[in-house]
A protein has these predicted regions:
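TPR/TPR-like (Sel1-like) alpha-helical repeat modules
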Residues: 102-106, 130, 136-157
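Start-of-domain marker
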Residues: 1-36
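Short, basic, low-complexity termini and linkers enriched in Ser/Thr/Gly/Pro
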Residues: 22-29, 53-56, 67-70
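Amphipathic alpha-helical repeat scaffolds of TPR domains
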Residues: 23-47, 77-95, 117-131, 159-178
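Canonical positions in the second alpha-helix
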Residues: 19, 72, 110-111, 149
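Short coil/turn connectors between adjacent alpha-helices in alpha-solenoid helical repeat scaffolds
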Residues: 2-8, 41-61, 90-101, 132-143, ...
Length: 181
């Protein structure tokens, strides 16, 4: 799956998610992480000019992801429910289904308080700050969170995680953008 991420073959992720039997799978948390990534991808694609036909799929994927997050709420690692629901609100905002920017940021911040050493949570919050409008975030602030996440990504369990690679990419992008400020 990491190779598919590197090659930007997101249809591989879609096929994996679609073929997984979420309700009975021991890999529910892994599938949820892929759904989180795929939703971000498909929402971004649907917003591109000439790709409006993807909008129904994007909306359906976000709702499906939201239902999985809600169903697993009590079983998710500390801070992950808040992280994933924050992402849902961002996706819905991008799809113009509802406006939740403050609720999204609030949940992302809450996730960092609940799980201050969880690299997924820290990286997600960095992503929120990276894309947030000036009053709510900055590349400089995002970089701090990405670098903090990177410290916790150092174990073997994260070696092949797509979020770790995305985190490293964001560190580079932040440093590049800050160089020109």
């Amino acid at each position: 799956m990491l190779d598919a991420y590197r090659r930007e073959e997101m249809n591989t992720w879609r096929d994996y998610i679609d073929s997984a039997r979420f309700e009975i799978s021991d890999l529910r948390f892994q599938i949820l992480l892929y759904e989180y990534g795929y939703c971000g991808y498909i929402v971004a694609e649907a917003k591109k000019e000439g790709k409006e036909a993807l909008m129904p799929e994007a909306k359906a994927r976000v709702q499906h992801f939201k239902s999985h997050v809600t169903r697993l709420a009590s079983q998710l690692p500390v801070g992950h429910y808040e992280m994933y629901m924050s992402a849902v609100y961002v996706y819905e905002l991008r799809l113009h289904e509802s406006i939740h920017p403050m609720k999204s940021m609030s949940l992302a911040k809450e996730a960092t308080k609940l799980a201050p050493q969880d690299p997924l949570v820290l990286s997600y919050y960095g992503t929120c700050l990276f894309y947030a409008p000036k009053p709510f975030g900055s590349k400089e602030e995002a970089l701090k969170w990405f670098e903090k996440a990177e410290k916790y990504f150092e174990g073997d369990e994260w070696r092949y995680c797509w979020v770790r690679e995305a985190n490293q990419m964001y560190i580079g992008q932040c440093k590049e953008k800050l160089k020109y400020l």
